[in-house]
């Protein structure tokens, strides 16, 4: 009698139930009644606390196209897997003990790169482990495509594609944030398929000046809208030179961009140049000074009541940012990130 355990760990995605069904069908086809499959609940959590049940063939029926995972899932960070918690639970020891308690010949684990690290740890502890690469990020070493990736690309592509109509109708710049903390496969694939005008990836630090130039070039070419596909882990060239802690601190200190209803079609009239020495004249006729090279003051209207009259004051530049651009994050030059 062969005994096989199966669990899913980490975030859910399309294809989990299909993969579970495939494993079960393959085992039943190969061994028939001489195999027992144990479904382990909620990922590694179930293996740690002994939450599992003996599955039957009918349990795997009708789940081929069902989203999520019938086994449940949870996140168990690899960096804490060997840490004894406040309840004196030795997670690694418990997993080994429950593996032996079920008398498993093999443990099949479905998950991403964090799950893979823990699976490898269990292998090093003497357990027979098979890891099936599941992640929408497509960042598992040793495989071309992970299951869950293609479905995520399709969904992200549809979002980018559908937003074109609104962007065109209102003449706006849209930023579509796509999942991908350290890798940009999903953003790249969806951006290309969905027709994004700018794609920013974690692997390639971006130059905000080039991004702004690209958007302005589209405006000059008569394009009323632009769509940016941005991976959640995308960073600028300036941020890339910082440590992780420095980057986090810099982002915490960076001002939140104010909201605005200005459209890109008004940019050329409002922001004719990005040179500090060639800013358009203010209402008083004098060129407004910029706090740093690359910033440019607007040429219309006085600051709102209550704000400082000094054009190098924080309140004045906050007003300028709100008036000049619907997205200061995009249009502010990299050299001007110190703008208050």
Residues covered by each model-derived region:
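A glycine- and small-aliphatic-rich helix-loop capping segment at beta-alpha/alpha-beta transitions
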Residues: 21-30, 54-59, 121-131, 147-151, ...
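Short, acidic/small-residue loops that bind anionic groups at enzyme active sites
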Residues: 30-32, 36, 122-146, 200-207
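Short beta-strand elements at the ligand-binding edges of bilobed clamshell
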Residues: 142-153, 287-294
């Amino acid at each position: 009698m062969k005994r096989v355990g199966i669990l899913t760990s980490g975030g859910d995605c399309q294809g989990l139930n299909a993969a579970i069904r495939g494993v079960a069908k393959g085992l039943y086809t190969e061994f028939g009644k001489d195999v027992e499959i144990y479904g382990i609940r909620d990922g590694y959590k179930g293996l740690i606390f002994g939450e599992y049940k003996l599955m039957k063939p009918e349990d795997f029926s009708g789940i081929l196209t069902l989203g999520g995972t019938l086994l449940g899932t949870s996140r168990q960070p690899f960096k804490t897997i060997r840490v004894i918690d406040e309840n004196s639970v030795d997670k690694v020891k418990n997993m080994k003990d429950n593996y032996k308690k079920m008398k498993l010949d093999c443990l099949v684990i479905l998950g991403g790169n964090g799950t893979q690290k823990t699976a490898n740890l269990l292998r090093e502890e003497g357990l027979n482990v098979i890891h099936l690469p599941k992640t929408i990020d497509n960042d598992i070493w040793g495989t071309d495509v992970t299951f869950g990736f293609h479905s995520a690309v399709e969904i992200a592509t549809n979002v980018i594609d559908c937003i074109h109509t609104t962007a065109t109708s209102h003449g706006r710049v849209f930023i579509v944030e796509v999942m991908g903390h350290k890798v940009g496969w999903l953003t790249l694939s969806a951006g290309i398929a969905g027709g994004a005008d700018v794609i920013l990836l974690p692997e390639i630090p971006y130059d905000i000046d080039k991004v702004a130039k690209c958007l302005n070039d589209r405006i000059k070419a008569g394009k009323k809208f632009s769509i940016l596909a941005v991976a959640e882990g995308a960073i600028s060239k300036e941020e890339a030179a910082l440590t992780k802690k420095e980057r986090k601190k810099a982002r915490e200190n960076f001002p939140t961009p104010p909201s605005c209803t200005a459209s890109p079609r008004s940019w050329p009239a409002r922001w004719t140049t990005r040179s500090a020495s060639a800013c358009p004249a203010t209402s008083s006729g004098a060129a407004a000074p910029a706090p740093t090279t690359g910033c440019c003051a607007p040429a219309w209207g006085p600051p709102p009541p209550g704000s400082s009259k000094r054009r190098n004051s924080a309140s004045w530049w906050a007003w300028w940012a709100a008036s000049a651009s619907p997205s200061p994050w995009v249009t502010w030059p990299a050299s001007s990130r110190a703008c208050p």
